């Protein structure tokens, strides 16, 4: 899947403000809205207030980044479209629980183990950058669902070469699963 988010958050040299005992990057207090990192080690703050506006199809996105999203989609000349933007904690809970149920049904594993497996593909509630209103999942021309097959397309190459110009990055590269916790 293609999950892009505005700006990047680069871990600095490890010290008491950026590294936990487990070695995972810790979000510094007071990080700017466009540098927020959300993952299993940095959940959404309970008091985080999204500034959302409605985008095509009723999806919501952060109002401070919507113009960059529109510009990126426009520059792609119809070869990409938005699949998923902001998700409420309730929706994330539903998606996660559905994945847990699927893992349990397919593997026979108990719930605790199924949750661990599910969390590698669907973020636990409160640990998805979609909960901020800054993450985007894109569908590429010719695809009706999220697929890794698009990685071999010219459109994917264009996105990787140009998304940073619009303030977006590929948030979960395949070779960084140990760092991001997301496959």
Give names to the regions the model predicted:
Residues 1-183:
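Extracytoplasmic cell-surface/polysaccharide-interacting catalytic and binding patches
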